[in-house]
Amino acid sequence: MALTSPVLGQDQLLGWAVKWAIAPYNINYRDFPTQMNTAGAHYTLNGWNTFAKSFITQGNLAKLRDAKLLCYAQPTRAATVRAETVVQRHSRYVIQFPFIQTCENVNQQNTQMLMATVTIDRVEDLDHPDGLAIEQLVVSSGRE
């Protein structure tokens, strides 16, 4: 199959994007290594390394462990395709959606509104049997 051919319909693509973009935000202090590995399997090596570096540099990992947090995320509106291009004979999609993340422990609860911009590449790689991989995830503070 050509790497410019869709591997999923648009609804399935948007669902895939939301599921794997917010997966690293649905974590807890005890199971985060397994949860992060599962999420990372749906990213390119560059995409995951960039995300992980940012996550650690911002202190999110230390905060998760030290405060023994349970974090969960869910979209607050439907995802939309912001761009669809062909880069080096591979389809590339830029998808955006708002989501809310709540982190809590026995003493506190913190909720934040976030905006995810996800760049997804169509790939042909045994490590990505679904034919897609997240090349970049940018999450910023956002309001609806």
Can you name each region flagged by the protein language model?
Residues 16-27:
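Solvent-exposed, amphipathic alpha-helical segments
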Residues 1-11, 25, 30-144:
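Structured, amphipathic secondary-structure segments that form assembly/contact surfaces
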